[in-house]
Amino acid sequence: MNYHISDRMASMRPSMVREILKATSDPSVIPFAAGNPAPNAFPVEQVQQIVGQILAERPIEALQYSITEGYPPLREALRQLCASHYGIPMREQDDLIVLSGAQQGMDLATKVLCNEGDTVLCEDPSFIGSLNCFRSYHVNLVGVPMEEDGISLPALEEALQREKNVRMLYLIPNFQNPTGITTSLEKRRELYRICAEAGVMILEDNPYGDLRFSGEAIPSLKSMDTEGIVIYVGSFSKILAPGVRVGWTIAPKPLIAKMTVGKQCADVHTTILTQMLCERWLATCDLQAHLARLQEIYRQKCALMLDCIDREFSPKVTHTTPQGGLFLWCTLPEGADMLDFCNRAVAEKVAVVPGVAFLADENAPCRSVRMNFSTPTDEAIVTGCQRLGRLTRELF
């Protein structure tokens, strides 16, 4: 049978990252293309204990329907966490709802703010999951080039003047996926001013902010939001576990009201059992000690990968030096064929993600690849960098 596919989905393709991971599911392939937290980062025993307690003490509440906005004790815990830990006080103008993972925040923000043909600006490169979300709403997706301290402000101003119906700017200010770049405080203040003057919303995605292993923490854009133009999205995926699928968003109340309606249509509410797990975990864990442990795991793994790259790779290959997060960005020399390099890497049993997957314009030229240091073992990092190093020295 010939099935009719909607215009909205006919042009959509699977994430290149997912396709690469599928193609390299062979356990002998070293997964530099992945983006998962380190397996030893999960507080498994705590989760087992908390879930057992919840099901023993409050089984019906955990398994029953609930309200779309989120489990009330978790919402209150998140308000307190945002104020005390993230420096984001709950202003009178704002409200908070629980999400089924941070990805739902991108979907709901786009659904609420954008009509077909409206413009969404994003860092170029940017997170492929969000890019595909924006594309699914048939917006005009425009990338703004990145610099070593965040998005290019002259290019942002030029895009705001050039493009029509710009509804929002999507940013990952901390340890950006895929580059590992962090937006400086000065640049955050200035891009906030630019967007406020232009009347453009900022969608601030902060899944990696707690994974800082060097340097000083930088205030979020939401903490500066006196004009009500920032939608902030947080997540438990990198600090607890991605499998719980719990995130949250703080946004102006009129937008939260519409996002709640959109969420009702999408999934009714986030799973109550995992919301209860997150609330009790926040109440019982030593969060600062837990985060310090995660930061040390990723500090060591990142340092190992950087050391191996500097030792093994051709000096013509450059890379970012992240202060946190899970990723770094390697750029091949002028004239290099990035896709050929990625295919040769797979032949050497090492998977990296071609940088073109992260561009707003998938046909634009790109000489970079994303490398992940959180998923592979230390031994795999060393072996994988040795294999890629030989390849870079042969080619460049």
What are these regions (language model features)?
Residues 1, 347, 362-396:
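PLP-dependent enzyme catalytic core of the Aspartate aminotransferase-like
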Residues 8-101, 108, 283-284, 351, ...:
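N-terminal small-domain helix-loop-helix segment of the aminotransferase-like
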Residues 29, 207, 346-370:
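Conserved PLP cofactor-binding pocket of PLP-dependent enzymes
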Residues 61-198, 203, 209-227, 298, ...:
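Conserved core of the PLP fold type I
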Residues 226-296:
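Conserved core segment of the aminotransferase class I/II
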Residues 279, 296-306, 318-331:
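Conserved glycine-rich beta-strand-loop-beta hairpin in the small C-terminal domain of fold type I
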Residues 316-349:
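Conserved PLP-binding catalytic core of the aspartate aminotransferase-like
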